[in-house]
Design a protein with these regions (language model features):
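Peripheral, non-AAA+ core regions of ATP-driven protein-machinery
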Residues: 1-281, 396, 538, 555-579
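The Walker A (P-loop) glycine that initiates the GxxxxGKT/S ATP-binding motif of P-loop NTPases
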Residues: 285, 350, 372
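Walker A/P-loop
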Residues: 283-322
Length: 579
């Protein structure tokens, strides 16, 4: 007897459809799973056997072969349990499922038959939707997440016995059991019967032809001795909430307002520019000047994710097993990731035999914050160079090459020197570092990486006697309004191009939309010679100037915009030793 169900697995962060083929044949009772399964999948044979028997069904006393197709793709995880169990029950004639060809099945089985949620449901269901599937059967714990994909009917299962339906006839074993408080535990009288059935299922006593399910003989399949239950899923239909939080709701970071930050008006200006064009930014200053505090407020001035971006980000978090509160809908706030400086390179960009998403992919469409950047291992920082340039992470393994999205804004902070007090301006906090030690400290961040950071901003220590430093200045709402207006201009300008922000301009599009004009070009070329700027720095200054012009509502870049952009290249200047 042959049957086929449909499931899915993760391959990187993408869902891949997997056919679960079940074959029952005469022979020694055993279950064999083939198709490059990992250990968790091979162990499914024991989980499914126990779950099927403990819920009143009969496990076939035949040679059970389960093939996961395509067979040349390595499969991982426990998401195939439900499809394997339903495949065995339908192939053995205990259930009939007319909609099996258009229903995706995902879920891990416990030994008592209950369903446990699995990770990566969202990309799996998206793959099924693209393949033409109409419904998904999965654990109730994943139902809210599954409902985020439109066009798919979601059926939520708490327990394998729920597949019988409220009016389906029970099997002979189920008739001899007493369900107490919703459990599948047998009574004392039924215990011996269940034990005998278990022995039969293991091939210890009964013969093959006495089984209550169809078996193939020389004259063809026989009729089942027990009632066949038609599997109707309507009683399992999941109804999603009528509405989810609006995309226009303020981000979590808006609870902490920039109006709380006294002074530092030029830093707020730099952060506004960075957010408007999604430019990389590095804040440099002594301890206690508010670098970390201001960057942590940065998500509050960024517009919420669009519907397309929200689905993209939510799928990445689902694949990484980090999707929380799926009942609230798609992730609408831009991600803000802040890994510790002890993180490894694999943790930052992703790793594993089948790589999982790293921090740069989890920060996709949002912000990756590296606090105290020089404390990160240099080799770890260097892995950022490719994703900062290409906006993707490419990881090569023996079996395949994986490409993950990594379109994020890099925000960093650092002290100006090893002791941290260079330029503090306080007589009791004088820098004790020599010029060579300052240079050695700053060299922990390589020149090519600094080249990819558009804004390098000094954050001085506020002076108590400076009235301007004690004023609150712009609030988060005001900065957010300016950023939204600038990004709206960019969206209109690049509506026919595969880019969203000024920071993504390159080549001919950069020359077209960020033309500095004759006067601006002369200014830039003179600075290229005096400061030794690279052509990459030249291009990034143009991108920054374009964003400054957008914030001013200007159609063309002026020399004033270029001059302001040049002020944010502080690390291009040599450090000065305090006397």
């Amino acid at each position: 007897m042959y049957g086929k169900m449909h499931s899915a697995c993760l391959y990187g962060i993408e869902g891949v459809m997997i056919g679960v083929e079940v074959d029952l044949a005469n022979g020694l009772p055993q279950t064999c799973i083939i198709g490059l399964p990992d250990s968790a999948i091979r162990e499914a044979a024991l989980r499914v056997r126990s779950a099927v028997r403990n819920c009143g069904f009969r496990y076939p006393q035949q040679r059970v072969t389960i093939n996961l197709a395509p067979a040349d793709l390595r499969k991982e995880g426990s998401a195939f349990d439900l499809a394997i169990a339903v495949g065995i029950l339908t192939t053995s004639g205990q259930l009939v499922m007319p909609s099996a060809g258009t229903t995706l099945m995902i879920g891990e089985l416990a030994l008592d038959g209950s369903l446990r949620p699995v990770t990566g449901v969202l990309p799996m269901i998206e793959a099924a939707r693209k393949a033409g599937f109409k419904a998904v059967l999965l654990p109730r714990g994943n139902a809210a997440e599954a409902a985020l994909i439109g066009g798919m009917q979601v059926y939520a299962v708490d327990h394998l016995r729920d597949l019988r339906g409220p009016e389906s006839p029970a099997s002979p074993i189920a008739n001899r059991t007493e369900e107490r408080s919703g459990s599948c535990e047998p009574t004392e009288a039924a215990g011996s019967a269940a034990s005998q059935a278990a022995d039969d299922a293991d091939g210890l006593d009964a013969g093959i032809n006495g089984l209550p399910f169809p078996v193939t003989t020389s004259s063809g399949p026989t009729s089942p001795a027990q009632p066949v239950m038609a599997l109707s899923l309507e009683h399992l239909r999941y109804t999603a909430p009528a509405s989810f939080p609006s995309a226009s709701e303020p981000a979590e970071a808006m609870r902490e307002d920039y109006s709380d930050v006294l002074g530092q008006h030029h830093v707020k200006r730099a952060l506004t520019i960075a957010a408007a064009g999604m430019h990389n930014i590095l804040l440099i200053g002594p301890p206690g000047t508010g670098k970390t505090m201001m960057i942590k407020r940065l998500p509050g001035i960024l517009p919420s994710l669009t519907d397309t971006e929200a689905l993209e980000v939510t799928q990445i978090f689902s694949a990484a097993g980090k999707l929380k509160n799926a009942h609230r809908g798609l992730i609408r706030e831009r991600p803000f990731r802040s890994p510790h400086h002890t993180i490894s390179g694999a943790g930052l960009i992703g790793g594993g035999s089948v790589p999982k998403p790293g921090e740069v992919s989890l920060a996709h469409r949002g912000i990756l914050f590296l606090d105290e950047m020089p404390e990160f291992t240099r080799s770890v920082l260097e892995v950022l160079r490719q994703p900062l340039e290409d906006h993707v992470v490419t990881l090569s393994r023996a079996r395949a090459t994986f490409t993950y999205p990594a379109r994020f804004m890099l925000a960093g902070s650092m002290n100006p020197c090893h002791c941290g007090f260079l330029g503090s301006g306080h007589p009791q906090q004088r820098c004790t570092c020599s010029a060579s030690r300052i240079a050695q400290y700053r060299s922990r961040i390589s020149g090519p990486l600094l080249d990819r950071i558009d804004l390098q901003v000094d954050v001085p220590r506020p002076r108590e006697w400076d009235a301007n430093a004690q004023s609150a200045g712009l609030s988060t709402a005001e900065m957010r309004s300016s950023v939204a207006a600038a990004q709206a201009l960019q969206a209109e300008r690049y509506r026919d191009l595969p880019i969203s922000w000024n920071s993504e301009l390159y080549g001919t599009t950069l020359r077209r939309y960020a033309d500095p004009g004759p006067e601006g070009a002369r200014m830039l070329h003179s600075l290229l010679e005096s400061l030794g700027l690279s052509m990459r720095s030249y291009d990034r200054i143009l991108k920054l100037s374009r964003t400054i012009a957008d914030l001013e509502g200007a159609d063309r870049i002026s020399s004033a915009h270029i001059a302001e952009a040049l002020q944010y290249r502080n690390l291009d200047k040599p450090p000065m030793e305090e006397g």
